[in-house]
Regions:
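A conserved acidic beta->alpha catalytic loop
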Residues: 26-34, 79
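Short, well-formed alpha-helical segments that are part of the catalytic scaffolds
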Residues: 2-17
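Acidic helix N-cap motif at the loop->helix transition within catalytic regions
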Residues: 6-10, 31-40
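Acceptor/aglycone-binding surface of glycosyltransferases and processive sugar-polymer synthases
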Residues: 43, 47-66, 71, 83-161, ...
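Conserved sequence signature across two-component system core domains
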Residues: 1, 25-27, 47
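Short loop->beta transition adjacent to catalytic acidic/histidine clusters or analogous donor-positioning motifs
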Residues: 14-23, 32, 40-42
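Hydrophobic helical membrane-anchoring modules
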Residues: 133, 157-239
Length: 239
């Protein structure tokens, strides 16, 4: 959570009505986000400076591992994710039908996603699928559930938005079971602080880096496809 003092209290109160162990990562907020979370009695990880999405996920993974949690649901604090969807992504993990459950915005197309975001997400997801052999619809969804095996065996390293792809690449290499569940994401205005072009480019570069490390044979077959997709991304952005 980064500067979410206006929404964090309501979110935590609603979550505490259904769930016991709640972790909030205060990612260098300059407002009262961290103080509010602490007063409401949840587990708070405090970053002295903003480390970004990847830094927050890394810290949450480590804390969940330390607490020996059986499952971890990652959930945005900006109001885009619906609390009622948590049980949907948690169910396959509880029933041992998957190691990772991803909440997808595209399986039922009920999320009113801004056009530029949809194009960017689908481009990055396409690159991820080509480079890993996965067949998923939303590689960039942050609404996920991980089981204990994932928490114990995967050590994310990316500090940026590329961490979502990194986890998928490492999971595929380990032959972990990945499933997607349809969810609805609420877009009221544009809550993102990321420049879409910078974000897209950074995720693509992260994907190339992790594919070259984890799947070197695949890496040399996708540069042309990546450059082609980047061209499409920039072309659409200028329309």
């Amino acid at each position: 959570a980064f500067n979410e003092e206006k929404s964090i209290a309501s979110l935590i109160i609603q979550l505490k009505m259904k769930y016991q162990n709640i972790i909030v990562c205060d990612d260098g907020s300059s407002d009262l986000t961290g103080n509010i979370a602490k007063e409401l009695g949840v587990i708070v990880i405090t970053h002295k400076k903003n480390l970004g999405y990847g830094g927050a996920i890394r810290s949450i993974f480590l804390k969940a591992r330390e607490l020996q949690m059986d499952a971890l649901v990652t959930f945005d604090a900006d109001g885009q994710h619906r609390i009622e969807d948590i049980d949907l992504v948690l169910k396959p993990i509880k029933e041992d039908k998957a190691d990772i459950s991803i909440g997808s915005r595209f399986l039922e197309n009920k999320s009113k996603i801004p056009k530029y975001r949809k194009i960017g997400i689908k481009t990055i997801t396409g690159i991820t699928n080509i480079s890993t052999g996965l067949k998923i619809s939303d590689s960039q969804s942050g609404f996920r559930c991980y089981n204990k095996k994932v928490l114990e065996e995967i050590n994310p390293s990316d500090f940026g938005m590329g961490i979502s792809t990194e986890i998928l690449i490492k999971s595929k290499k380990m032959n972990l079971r990945i499933i997607e569940i349809p969810i609805v994401v609420l877009y009221e205005g544009d809550t993102s602080t990321q420049n879409p072009i910078t974000h897209g480019a950074s995720v693509i570069l992260s994907t190339m880096k992790f594919v070259s490390i984890e799947r070197p044979l695949s890496f040399y077959g996708i540069p042309g496809m990546i450059l082609f997709c980047i061209g499409i991304f920039f072309t659409v952005w200028t329309l």
